[in-house]
């Protein structure tokens, strides 16, 4: 699922332009790129609404470390991206794994019905990896709206450029919504 064609000519040109600075440590907080991504998505230029990590797995690990405590439940469907289970288990949480629907989509109704007082997080891969199926955007909006606000909803959009509508605009309405995107799959 990585780019088999190599970097674009523009990327090579940009790297060549900066090669004289490779001896300098990069900004560990990625301030400039966080600011630019934030502004691109309708936030102020503080960068406070953007986190940069090494792939979706890095973000999921951070979310697990910050939010998941022993006994907390995290709901997701399988088959899907394996890092959800890993982030839960590493932090002593309990994965609540549900099957996909017959048409291989995340079963939002079953996920909602699985919510308990121990539910801390819900993870939705949209489009799903490995099936490529997409959850209807209106159904996803309704789901996000009705989930209790103390539950973190993670929508993993690593493959969003291949189908579906991004949930990024919904971040402005729902403080419990985290949207993950990546540079390695698209953009």
How would you name each of these model-derived features?
Residues 1-57, 62:
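N-terminal small-domain helix-loop-helix segment of the aminotransferase-like
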């Amino acid at each position: 699922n990585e780019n088999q064609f190599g970097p674009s000519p523009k990327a090579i040109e940009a790297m060549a332009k900066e090669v004289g600075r490779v001896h300098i440590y990069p900004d560990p907080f990625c301030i400039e790129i966080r600011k630019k991504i934030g502004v691109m998505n309708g936030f102020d230029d503080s960068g406070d609404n953007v986190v940069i990590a090494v792939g979706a797995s890095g973000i999921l690990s951070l979310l697990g470390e910050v939010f998941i405590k022993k006994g907390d439940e995290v709901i997701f469907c399988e088959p899907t991206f394996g890092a959800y289970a890993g982030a839960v288990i590493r932090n002593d949480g309990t994965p609540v794994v549900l099957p996909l629907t017959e048409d291989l989509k995340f079963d939002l109704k079953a996920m909602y019905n699985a919510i308990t007082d121990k539910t801390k997080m819900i993870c939705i891969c949209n489009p799903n990896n490995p099936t490529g199926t997409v959850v209807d955007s209106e159904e996803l909006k309704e789901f996000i709206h009705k989930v209790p606000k103390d539950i973190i909803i993670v929508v993993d959009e690593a493959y969003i450029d291949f189908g579906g509508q991004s949930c990024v605009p919904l971040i402005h309405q729902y403080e419990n919504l985290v949207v993950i995107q990546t540079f390695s799959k698209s953009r």
